[in-house]
From Swiss-Prot:
It comes from the Eukaryota. Belongs to the major facilitator superfamily. Sugar transporter (TC 2.A.1.1) family. The lineage of its organism: Eukaryota, Fungi, Dikarya, Ascomycota, Taphrinomycotina. GO terms for molecular function: phosphate transmembrane transporter activity. This is Probable metabolite transporter C2H8.02. It comes from Schizosaccharomyces pombe (strain 972 / ATCC 24843). Residues 282-338 are annotated as: Disordered. Residues 314-327 have a biased composition (Low complexity). The modification Phosphoserine is found at residues 267, 269, 289-290, 292, 330. One of its GO terms (cellular component) is endoplasmic reticulum. Keywords: Endoplasmic reticulum, Golgi apparatus, Membrane, Phosphoprotein, Transmembrane, Transmembrane helix, Transport. Its main location: endoplasmic reticulum.
Length: 583
């Protein structure tokens, strides 16, 4: 095995799958892109994210209908309180936090197979309860509380999909294709948003005669229920395949503390960690290779460190915490209880080198989602600020609002995701995340400084570009990095924590956006988003570049180093070490 120092170098074409992988590299690819098994994984997990995005963002298109139906919008005296609007908009994100933490923990504790699919059951039940809102509920506020309660439940199911799909995809992908597959799955959020816009336009077209010709706006009561109810179809379709998904072999090995590969680690003294004395780096671009390939790699990368073939440590195997019976035995005497405890989540993150990765991943996601959801959950409000709320009647206003959302989705939202899919293995995660933060920062600065004077076309272009660089930027990488930077034994819960922090930012934005817009104006709210983008770019510097990073192998090497009395496997004197390994 070798470790290449250049995180952006070309991967060997003959790279073999990870030892415990379910997908064979030699399998014929569909259209030269993905294998059949990868396509199945993308369909099962990707459909879930399409559904997740649809459910999360459809409230953006339903909210004006709720204002018309229940808050006097049809009488010309609309009074949809910003506080209640914010709570209803934030409901799914509140549930997301619960679901991400709960299912992330359960995914690590019980296993991926036991948990996967259960979150979709919650989504199906919650969606049915949402569309069954009783008309006999007397007050608009009570109706909104019904929607709030069951959209929280919906959010729990949607939230559970984040850590589970991320962990399963990461553990069942080739290491040099992992980022692209994770980004591909996450990109289905773009299609979900597009589906919401298209579905709304089709539904409105079906109701054109009663709404536009006869002015029977009570029919909107059926429109919003259909908007929510459409999500049931993909949810039911994907449920059975998820329940039948096999356990990740990589995860099973991580939980089997006495697996065959574990014994190899007891010979940790045979790992050539003496290279640290020569100031050589371990944590860089990781590739699995045959002995001959490793030798070739070493010639190109003289700083690589070897594991002897007869004592090969499988990257996907769980780390052993048992004391060595070789030359390191004396160093581990009296430490056995600490080592055994070290397999737990708390013990893993009590070390600063691990804790800072969790902090950096979580904080960057938090800062991103303040701006990302501030824009997306209130895109209809923003379109109104741009003049998209004008029309002959309510029907045309709703139609124009959906068209505006559709244009932004097509112009910036979806292309941004797919540029990430294409370039994530070329540019690396860290660079994409930082440039996305900085360009969004620039765009928000332009909008904030010129909001009162810039033309409608200029506003629209800036918002569309911001959507592009959100997705060709931190919105994609904040999902990918936690799935790659943590080892399998803590991956799902760690990803859940990071995602939950992101949703905390989304909730904060959803609750405060409308109120702050009323108090300080929309332009000044954009200055807050500007600050979040600057902070996000700075926080990203904490994180390592995760392209081709094998977190399980790093975990095992850290344990081997610990057994030899070493505290780190990183050479900070290496050129660009601050970028490769984080500051």
């Amino acid at each position: 095995m070798g470790f290449k120092l250049n995180p952006f170098s070309k991967k060997p074409k003959d790279e073999e799958p990870l030892p415990l992988e379910q997908y064979e590299a030699s399998e014929q690819k569909i259209l030269g892109l993905v294998t059949k098994k990868e396509a199945k994984l993308l369909a099962i997990a990707g459909t879930g994210f399409l559904l997740d995005s649809y459910d999360l963002f459809i409230i953006n298109l339903v909210s004006p209908i709720l204002a018309y139906l229940y808050w006097g919008g049809l009488t010309g005296h609309q009074d949809y309180p910003s506080g209640i609007r914010g709570v209803v908009n934030a409901a799914t994100n509140i549930g997301n936090i619960m679901g991400q933490l709960l299912f992330g923990f359960l995914g690590d504790f019980f296993g991926r197979k036991f948990v996967y699919g259960k979150e979709m059951m919650v989504v199906i039940i919650a969606t049915i309860l949402i569309i069954c809102l009783p008309d006999r509920i007397p007050t608009p506020t009570a109706k909104m509380m019904w929607l709030f309660a069951f959209r929280v439940m919906l959010g729990i199911g949607i939230g559970g999909d984040y850590p589970m799909s991320a962990s399963i995809t990461s553990e069942q992908s080739l290491i040099n294709r992992r980022g692209a597959l994770l980004a591909w799955i996450f990109s289905n959020q773009g299609w979900g948003t597009l589906a919401g816009c298209v579905a709304t336009l089709i539904i409105l077209a079906c109701f054109e005669k009663p709404l536009n010709d006869r002015g029977e706006y009570t029919k909107l009561n059926g429109v919003w229920r259909i908007q929510f109810g459409i999500a049931l179809f993909p949810a039911v379709i994907v449920l059975i395949p998820r329940l039948r998904m096999q356990e990740s072999e990589q995860f099973k090995n991580s939980k089997n503390m006495k697996s065959p590969g574990e014994g190899d680690l007891d010979s940790a003294s045979q790992i050539e960690l003496h290279d640290f004395k020569k100031k050589e780096s371990l944590t860089a671009e990781f590739t699995t290779s045959s002995p001959s390939t490793a030798s070739l790699s070493d010639k190109k990368n003289p700083g690589s460190v070897h594991i002897r073939p007869n004592n090969e440590v499988a990257p996907s195997s769980a780390p052993s915490r048992a004391p060595s019976t070789t030359s390191v035995e004396s160093n581990t005497e009296g430490k056995e209880s600490d080592i055994q405890t070290g397999s737990s989540f708390v013990s893993y993150f009590k070390e600063w080198r691990h804790a800072k990765l969790l902090i950096g991943s979580a904080l960057s996601w938090f800062l991103l989602d303040i701006a990302f959801y501030g824009i997306n959950l209130n895109q209809s409000v923003i379109l109104q600020e741009m003049g998209f709320n004008k029309g002959v009647n309510e029907y045309h206003i709703l139609q124009k609002n959906a068209i505006g959302n559709l244009i932004i989705a097509v112009a910036g939202y979806i292309p941004g995701y797919w540029v990430s899919v294409v370039l994530i293995e070329v540019m690396g995660r860290k660079w994409i995340q930082i440039q996305g933060f900085l360009i969004c920062c620039l765009l928000f600065g332009v909008l904030a400084g010129t909001w009162e004077t810039i033309s409608t076309g200029g506003r629209f272009a800036c918002v569309a570009l911001a959507q592009f660089f959100f997705n060709f930027g931190p919105n994609t990488t904040c999902f990918v990095i936690p799935a790659e930077v943590f080892p399998s034994r803590v991956r799902a819960f760690s990803h859940g924590i990071c995602a939950a922090c992101g949703k905390a930012g989304a909730i904060l934005s959803a609750l405060l956006f409308n109120k702050l817009t009323e108090v300080i104006g929309f332009g000044n709210v954009l200055w807050i988003f500007f600050g979040c983008m600057v902070a996000g770019a700075v926080v990203t510097l904490i994180l390592p570049e995760t392209a081709n990073r094998d977190a399980d192998l790093i975990d095992r090497l850290e344990i081997a180093a610990m057994q030899q009395g070493r505290t780190s496997i990183i050479d900070r004197s290496e050129k660009w070490a601050w970028w490769k390994h984080g500051i």
